[in-house]
């Protein structure tokens, strides 16, 4: 992965009337998917030696699709985008496009440095992805003009619609939100900060039709609060290992079954967050471990992430059993 420099002058294809039409169609598909189900962020499968296990990824993604998600986001944070080289990324996104076969939108991850973001955007476009989630950069702080400028430049280099992601060092001001919403091809914002005061200001400032997503860690915890400020759609890490639990929560929330929502939060989601917070990186490591406990061929995480300790794995096993029992008992 290269330094954050713009060395490729032919990284994209620009925008135009055909792009505008395609973007509108993707937005409508995303909007429909958001209303229908949770957003799936599949894991990327690896062999024990750390190499890509594409067959394992395909098998895992099939279980995700069978649960009826609103959209699929391969090679994003949960999919360990940070660790994938260009060829691995191409294989993962291509497999996701082939398996979904148009059933739901495929939104591939890209981001970090400018040159890397542009190259991966081209790969995703060539693979047939529907849109891109622009993951935050790291290590360097950037002013608002820089955050907006990165999206402007990326939008010039790809026909794919872009969803900005604010998390970590990336936080958009209200004025920046207005600016990025005017960029052709930028269609939405995923929020991982959980600053609901700021988020409410952003949703009020956005033009009609601009998409917002709850991207908080274990988003179900704050799903009701996000919905109250106009952001009901959310990503679900739990869906990656227990779509039954994620689906039951989503249905209870959608249908206004407050007692069922609170029971799942109290007995499964809150303990899961407490377990997740024990060790940095468990936001991915625990999810993969839980998927392995269910017989999914997802393999280990890649460094610098580490797999859960024996004690934490035992707690995860017990908690997973509790969650599945809750769903099996119809809450």
Curated annotation (Swiss-Prot):
SMART domains: DHDPS. Residues 1-23 are annotated as: Disordered. Residues 10-23 have a biased composition (Low complexity). It comes from the Bacteria. The keyword Lyase applies. One of its GO terms (biological process) is D-glucarate catabolic process. Pathway: Carbohydrate acid metabolism; D-glucarate degradation; 2,5-dioxopentanoate from D-glucarate: step 2/2. Pfam families: DHDPS. Keywords: Lyase. GO terms for molecular function: 4-hydroxy-tetrahydrodipicolinate synthase activity; 5-dehydro-4-deoxyglucarate dehydratase activity. Its EC number is 4.2.1.41. It catalyses: 5-dehydro-4-deoxy-D-glucarate + H(+) = 2,5-dioxopentanoate + CO2 + H2O. Belongs to the DapA family. NCBIfam families: PRK03620.1. HAMAP family: KDGDH (MF_00694). This is Probable 5-dehydro-4-deoxyglucarate dehydratase 2. It comes from Streptomyces avermitilis (strain ATCC 31267 / DSM 46492 / JCM 5070 / NBRC 14893 / NCIMB 12804 / NRRL 8165 / MA-4680).
